[in-house]
Amino acid sequence: MEMNQKTAFMGINIKDEGPSNVMIIKALNSSSSLLDIPSFMKVAGIEFDPIMFNHFWQVLVDNGDRLPHVGETTLNWLGYEGVFTKQKEKFINMLKRNQISFKELSYQDNEIQLYPSIQKEMLLLPNESAKTKSKWLLMNPDDFKMAIMGLKTKNSEKIKRYYVTLEKTMKLHSEYALYFHDRKAQEEKERERQRAEDEKRSILGEMSEMRQYMQKMGITLEDTREEVKKVNIQNKDIKAQNEEIKAQNEDLAFDLSDVRDRLIEAAEDRSPKLETKPLRERFVIIKRKDSSFPYYAIRGQDVYVKGRLTHFKNTRYPELKIIFDTNYQPNPRNLYIRFKELKDERFIIAGNNIKTVDSSNKLEKEMLELFEKLNEEKHNIYFFFNFNDF
C-alpha cells in the first residue's frame, strides 16, 4: 500500500489528502450527518428516479428467508404489457428459456400470510375459485438480476442503464461513507487531544493555586503529612464499623431469604384454580405433518382446547401429537404473547403457526424449553428492599 493510502475496502483506497472525486467532496461538505443513498444521489447530481430506485431497492435487496414477491406492479415496471395473467405467463416463459430459478405459492400455502402484497392481490380476485387457481411468483435477488439482464421489453434498456448507474452509485457511496467515518474519527481524536490539553492545563493551574495558598497560610509539607495520618486512622475506624454493619445486613438477608421461600410456597394461590375443570385455562402446542409450519399453538379453556384437538385429528391431522401441555395456565394468551415478544430468530411465527429455522430436533427441544421457562415465570416473586428502611 502506498504511504498516502490509509486503508482499502472493497477495492476503495482512503488517502491522507482526501478524496479527488468531485461528487464525494460535495457530499462530504453538504452535511455533518451521513447521507443515505437517495440523498447522496441528489447532492452529487446523479439522476434519481424514485420509481426506478424503489423497485430496485425492494426487489434486489436480500430480505433473509423471505423471497421478494414479483407482482403486477413489478411486471409493469419491467415493461410487460397486456393483462396481468399474460404478463406473468410471458415472464415465466422467459425465465424457463434462460433456466432462471423461481418459486410459486398457491392459495393453500401458509407462507402467503408473510406477504401483504399477495394478500392485496387476493382481495381483487372475483371469487373463491379464482383464488384456488391463482399462483404468486417469488424470486431471490440474484435470480431477479439475471432476469433483468435477459429482458427484451420496451423498458429493458432503460432498466439496464439505471442498474449500471446504481452499481456505480453504490461504489461511490461506499467511498464517501469511508471518508465520512474517517473524518469523524479524526475529529474525535482532535477533540480527545484538546480535552487532554485542557485537563492538563486545569491540573497545573490548580497545583499552582494550591502552592500559593499553602505559602500564604504558612502550611508546610510536614503539616500536610500529619493531617493525612490522622485521616488514615479515622478511615480504619470507619472500615471496622462498616464490617460490623455488613455482618448485620447478612443476617437480615438470611431472614429475608426465609420469608421469600415461604412466599414462593404460596405462589400457586395467586391465581386460584376454577372448580369446574372444563373452564380452566389451558395452553397446548401440537406437532403435525405440515411442511410449512409443523407446530401450532392452541390456547383457551380446557373444553375449547379439547374441541380443537378433536377437530384437527378427525379432519386434517390424524397423526398430530401434543408436545407441550400446561395442566393449568391462568393466562395462556399472556404466555404466547411473551413468546412472540422475544422475537427469537430461531423461530418464525405466523398467527398461531410456528416453525423453526431448520427442522432439527435440537431447535424443537429448545423451543419447548423456552415455553417451559416462560410458564414457570408465573412463580417468580421479586423483592426490592432498601436496607436504610430497617
UniProtKB/Swiss-Prot annotation:
UniProt key word Coiled coil: yes
Domain of life the protein comes from: Viruses
Residues in coiled coil: 181-263
Signal peptide (residue range): none
Key words, A-Z: Coiled coil
Designated name of the protein: Putative MSV199 domain-containing protein 211L
Protein species of origin: Invertebrate iridescent virus 6 (IIV-6)
